[in-house]
Structures are given as structure tokens and as C-alpha cells.
Amino acid sequence: MNKKIFTILFMLFSFLCIPANAVNIKENNGVYHIVLKSNRKTLKKLKCISVQDLMTNREIHKKSKAVLTVNGGFFDPVNKKSVSYVYTDRGLVEDPIFNENLYKSGIVRKNMDKILNRTEFRILECFDGYKTEISAHKNPVDFECQLVSAVQAGPLIDPQLQLDEEFFVVKDEEGNIIRESASVLHRAPRTIIGLEGDKYIHFLIFTDNHPVTLEEASKYCAKLGIDRAMALDGGGSTSFNYKKKIEVVSTPEKNQGRALKSFIMLNK
């Protein structure tokens, strides 16, 4: 009996017993689950980046000779400008305030505060080491920490789903949804990043073979024990590359993924 219990516990916990610099990837029914250990060694090599001209996940992954590359924040494919804040090497490199296309729509202008305060993934260097957090953009960084890198997207999906708060849905006076962005209420490929305390960083890649709503993605995160999670750009942007071993793209264009603006990358 004791041997049987030990075997079950070993199977449950072996997935998260990974070396300090390892990338653990499992695929099940069209969902890729990527786990990184959130320690100094990993976080010094993990960064959020943007490119001047749009590039596919494959292109930037190959050019950077990265270990892991995952698609990042929102962008405008017409003017190739970011709709999300991006910080790289302790500096702001993308600011959606300067994306003139955001100001062409009256309803978007009216809700700019919500758009600019969407959720972001942060890497911080603090007095006691490197940390990660998922937070609204306007939430200040703790005074003992410095922002090293960040990418904004949204919405927050765990512990609560913030569709209205981050302007992904608009409701009329009776509470009926009259506008939807990023197909948040419909099933689509998704890229999710989540944090399990200060121990692990989780990426969930829901492929074309397993599209989900954000509510379904939220429940999936809860089952995995993820404490806090947010959506990155999804749909046709969903993509990731791992070394030269794995490539996942959504609705391939010319046998490669969509050209994108920003990425989360783990370097060698």
C-alpha cells in the first residue's frame, strides 16, 4: 500500500522537479504546457523584446539562437506599431500612446485608460534577488525592486477574469455585451503565462487543435495550481519555438506563423 502511494506521489510531483535551468514541455490533446523554474539563473536569461519590423516567432528565435521563444503582446499589423507596453534591459521600448491608430475610434479613445492599464508580465531585480509578477501596468513596482523587462497584453484571467476592466468587452446600459476584442468570448488558440508563487513560470499554448475561451483557460490554470495568470496575444499570433526541436504556430501562413511585434525569450 505504501509503495503504491509513493508511486502516485512520484508521478504527481516529478513534473515540477526540474533542474534549475531546464525547460519542461509536455503536450496533451493539443495543449502545450511549458514550465520554467523561477530562479535567478533562469530570470537573468528571460527577457521581453520587440522588433522594429514585424518578424515571425521562427525568425526571431533563429536569429537570437534562443532556447525558447513565445509570442508576446498586441500590435497593429497595419502600421506595425505596438498596442502594448514593452520594456527591455530596464528601458521602455514600446509605448502604445504613440500608436496613432488607437485614436481613430471614438470608443477606443474613450477607453484609453483601460487599454493603457492592461495586465503585464514583469521581471524584476530586487534587493533579495530576481522576481516575476503579473500586474496592471499602472501598479507601481515595489521600491526595493527595479523593472528589468516586461510585456503587456491581457486580460488577467486568474484569479479573476477582467474582460470589462481591460476593455476586451463593452456592455450597454442593460449589461449586454455589444463589443468584443481578441475573440475573448469565443474559442480560439491562446497563449497564456502564469505564475505559481515564486517557484515556477508556466506557459500554456492552446493550439488550433484545442481552442478555448478565456474562461476555459482560466479554469485550466486553476486546475494546475497557478496562482496568477494572464493572456498574451492569441488567435493567429499564438506561436512558440523550443531550440530546434519544437515549433508551434497557429493558422500557418506560407508554412510559418504570423509576423509579430513582441516576444518573451529565454536565451542560452
What residue spans do the PLM features occupy?
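Classical Sec-dependent N-terminal signal peptides that target proteins to the secretory pathway
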Residues: 2-20
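Gly/Ser/Thr/Pro-rich low-complexity, intrinsically disordered segments
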Residues: 18-268
